């Protein structure tokens, strides 16, 4: 305990002796306007704060929270935070909020970060009372206060974190404001301990007599998982706010290397403003000086400056030359024309963007790339004319905008005046428009084409390593979906909604036009499409069960009218433990005296849930397979789906739609609402792309809208282009929603495949779909090694999280998805020559118990591993899968 006493004495004496800013730096000392405010609604001194306002009569002040250092041993030193680092900030015009928090003697970690986040939530909830502008909340602290400030920043939006068998609740339940956000917008870390695993001589944990041991409640060497969870460096991601890190190189309490390690990780994530090393700076003395205080103030002034920006401030929006310019970390990504519909009177001068609100909404999906998602954005608005309001949302991973019209009086919408300006020479992967969205995403550097019509999504590499994925979201009734056209000007991609002759009355808004912006990791991991879409409209979702499907059509185009073939696929589902079988087209003409009722009865008797196919009867009708004309009229649709429900049908596949006009969008919604009433899962085939319905109607588990494995039945070109095409889909089509590619072809259809077995297996993980239809025939699947059959029988189609590992469109793709405590990692080579793929998972899976590797061999190489290789040598058009148990 002597060592702890020495540390505390050193910190306190140092702060008191040297913390007061130099005379003349600012004006006279400011007393707190609000003293001993309790932010938790209890009587604890540890839950008090002082609020200092600048001198003056400004209506509101932007906020900086300041936290004292005490090796986490003190619960009542909020005044020291102001004495040390607060005054320069009030002099600069900030409201400074100095908070107490529970000490390590009061409670173990994570109680201290719970207190910090509770204080921030309290400030947002009571901003009016204290004249605070909480559109900006910065945070700063020194020593242990630097640790808590850094931790508050790097855990923005995180509810909890698990390392190994240990889970930490990061938000806590202190205070009565659970609906408020605890995010911070910028961080200044003064010599805080940030990597508890390297506190002793920059290499190892300190002994059990250290302050961090008291904070954790045990010797760090005995608690490696908690050491990781208590360390801010563990949480650094691309979504962190901007950081300024300051540390003296003569600090004998917290080693300078702590901040060096931290700054390195922040730099990699693109979150570091600057790392300042103060020559001769100690744990306070010399490090605190007029120059470093000014750097802190300038940083907070810069970060709080009025501008349209994302919550993490990496993405900004400004107006220039009549366009809206989207920038990512200072680099121009998109220039957008957004001029409405020309319905109202325009203004003499272009109107300015104004801040509307900060939006923060957590929600849960039933399928998709991430179960728990957060819809967090800053919303701005601008008047286009006297009847049209343009609403912008700036997210950490993208932008979205829509038009809101008022006073519609029986008018039809004129042409929309929206365009994306994409210079020639930029890398792009865009499919030519087709009605069912079934085309390749070829690499190009030009917008030239035969008909200059393009389908969503469209991926653009705007700057080296910085991408924009264009699409749209939240299609509702009275709306059409759109495509892109660049006829007339090859660099100007106009947004062109499909035909909409509906006469509008009252108020109306467009769908969200959206762009995911950032690195390829931002693109792959984004949930922007569902963030923008309406919440789930179903009151009961307990019947919705995603899963893997035994599918007849790929090997037997007319097999669903053959009862014996259906039995084979049901039996395969039983053998491989697949929950579903899909009986495809032509079941209404069953041969051999059997009926669809017989097939459904057989599937149910074997414990397999049947799904059946329908023709939508709005697209291909003449000469098309049936059943047809059973869903178009409301009364027919209800009768048919009631019959399905009575028979025990689990879901329906509805095929052959026609276009994206308002009538068809309404038809999709009619189908989803009717199937929900009868507890039927939905797969839309020959259809439009996902635009967020997977959130609003979560029983809609997949959509085709992809040039998938079905095309091995149709054209020889798919054989040679499939591998490269497959590596574009994780960065384009599958980003926006579930994709019914129908993967896993080990044998051949009408045209052969030349991808390897491991490549095909990897597609089942690489491609996300709530219903994953397996393409191949029973004899092919049943001939595979038992490990492969077990893998497919246990394959999740619901993912807790998805992480980009490596890859580039057309070359390779490596993605990791987690289901519970199991990570599935899949990679494919899209090239015709051998490649070494980056599969470094150390940051994603730092520890694990067991791993099974599926690699390319003569057909297979399957083995267990105690260590995961960081690279994989992949055969031409090859692949791999890891199944890693934590």
Residue ranges and their predicted role:
Residues 20-59:
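N-terminal cap/lid segment of alpha/beta-hydrolase-fold proteins
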Residues 586-756:
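Aromatic- and carboxylate-enriched substrate-binding clefts and catalytic-loop regions
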């Amino acid at each position: 305990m002597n060592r702890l006493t020495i540390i505390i004495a050193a910190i306190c004496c140092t702060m008191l002796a040297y913390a007061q800013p130099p005379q003349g730096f600012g004006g006279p000392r400011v007393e707190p306007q609000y003293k001993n405010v309790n932010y938790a609604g209890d009587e604890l001194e540890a839950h008090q704060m002082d609020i200092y306002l600048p001198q003056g009569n400004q209506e509101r002040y932007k906020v900086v929270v300041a936290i004292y250092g005490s090796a986490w041993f003190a619960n009542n030193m909020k005044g020291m935070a102001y004495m040390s680092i607060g005054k320069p900030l009030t002099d600069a015009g900030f409201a400074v909020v100095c908070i107490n928090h529970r000490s390590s003697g009061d409670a173990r970690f994570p109680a201290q970060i719970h207190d910090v986040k509770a204080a921030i939530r309290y400030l947002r909830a009571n901003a009016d009372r204290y004249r605070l502008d909480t559109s900006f909340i910065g945070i700063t602290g020194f020593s242990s206060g630097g640790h808590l400030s850094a931790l508050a920043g790097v855990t923005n939006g995180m509810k909890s974190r698990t390392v190994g068998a240990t889970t930490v609740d990061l938000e806590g339940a202190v205070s009565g404001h659970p609906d408020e956000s605890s995010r911070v917008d910028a961080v200044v870390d003064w010599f805080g301990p940030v990597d508890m695993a390297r506190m002793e001589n920059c290499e190892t944990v300190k002994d059990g007599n250290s302050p961090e041991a008291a904070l954790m409640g045990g010797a760090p060497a005995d608690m490696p998982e908690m050491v990781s969870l208590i360390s801010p460096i563990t949480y650094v991601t691309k979504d962190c706010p901007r950081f300024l890190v300051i540390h003296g190189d003569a600090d004998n309490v917290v080693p300078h290397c702590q901040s060096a390690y931290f700054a390195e990780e922040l730099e990699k994530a693109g979150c570091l403003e600057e790392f300042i090393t103060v020559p001769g700076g100690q744990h306070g003395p010399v490090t605190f000086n007029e120059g470093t205080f000014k750097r802190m103030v300038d940083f907070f002034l810069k970060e709080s400056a009025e501008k349209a920006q994302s919550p993490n401030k990496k993405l900004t929006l400004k107006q220039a030359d009549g366009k809206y310019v989207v920038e990512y970390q200072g680099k121009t990504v998109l220039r957008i024309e957004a001029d409405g519909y020309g319905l109202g009177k325009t203004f003499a001068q272009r109107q300015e963007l104004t801040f509307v609100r900060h939006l923060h909404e957590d929600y849960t999906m039933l399928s998709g790339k991430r179960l728990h998602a957060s819809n967090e954005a800053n919303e701005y608005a601008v008047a286009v004319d006297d009847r049209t309001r343009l609403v912008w949302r700036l997210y950490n991973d993208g932008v979205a905008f829509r038009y809101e019209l008022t006073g519609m009086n029986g008018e039809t919408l004129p042409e929309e005046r929206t365009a994306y300006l994409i210079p020639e020479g930029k890398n792009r992967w865009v499919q030519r428009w087709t009605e069912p969205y079934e085309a390749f995403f070829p690499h190009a550097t030009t917008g030239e084409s035969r008909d200059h019509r393009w389908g969503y999504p469209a991926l653009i590499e705007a700057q080296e390593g910085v991408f924009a994925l264009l699409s749209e979201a939240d299609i509702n009734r009275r709306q059409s979906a759109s495509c892109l056209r660049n006829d007339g000007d090859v660099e100007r991609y106009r947004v062109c909604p499909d035909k909409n002759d509906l006469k509008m009355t009252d108020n109306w808004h467009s769908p969200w036009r959206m762009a995911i912006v950032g690195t390829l990791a931002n693109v792959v991991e984004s949930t922007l499409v569902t963030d923008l879409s309406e919440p789930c409209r179903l009151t009961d979702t307990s019947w919705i069960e995603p899963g893997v499907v035994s599918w007849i059509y790929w090997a037997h185009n007319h097999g669903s009218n053959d009862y014996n073939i259906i039995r084979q696929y049901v039996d395969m589902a039983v053998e491989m433990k697949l929950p579903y079988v899909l009986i495809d087209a032509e079941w209404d003409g069953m041969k051999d005296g059997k009926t669809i009722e017989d097939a459904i009865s057989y599937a149910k008797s074997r414990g397999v849930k049947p799904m059946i196919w329908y023709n939508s009867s709005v697209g291909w009708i003449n000469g098309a397979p049936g059943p047809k004309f059973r869903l178009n009229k409301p009364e027919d649709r209800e009768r048919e789906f009631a019959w399905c429900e009575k028979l025990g049908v689990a879901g329906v596949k509805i095929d052959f739609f026609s276009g994206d006009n308002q009538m068809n969008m309404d038809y999709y919604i009619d189908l989803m609402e009717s199937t929900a009433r009868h507890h039927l899962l939905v797969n839309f085939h020959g259809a439009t792309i996902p635009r967020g319905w997977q959130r609003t109607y979560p029983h809609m588990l997949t959509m085709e809208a992809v040039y998938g494995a079905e095309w091995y039945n149709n054209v020889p070109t798919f054989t040679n282009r499939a591998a490269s095409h497959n590596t574009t889909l994780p960065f384009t089509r599958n980003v926006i929603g579930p994709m019914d590619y129908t993967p896993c072809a080990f044998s051949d259809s009408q045209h052969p495949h030349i991808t390897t077995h491991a490549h095909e297996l990897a597609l089942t993980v690489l491609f996300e779909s709530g219903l994953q239809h397996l393409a191949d025939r029973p004899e092919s699947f049943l001939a595979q090694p038992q490990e492969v059959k077990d893998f497919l029988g246990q394959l999740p189609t619901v993912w807790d999280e998805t992480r980009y590992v490596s890859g580039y469109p057309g070359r390779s793709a490596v993605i990791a998805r987690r289901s519970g405590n199991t990570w599935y990692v899949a990679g494919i080579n899209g090239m015709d020559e051998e490649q070494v793929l980056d599969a470094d998972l150390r940051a994603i899976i730092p520890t694990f118990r067991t791993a099974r590797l599926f690699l390319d061999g003569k057909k297979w190489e399957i083995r267990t591993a105690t260590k995961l290789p960081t690279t994989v040598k992949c055969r031409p058009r090859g692949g791999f899968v890891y199944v890693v148990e934590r």
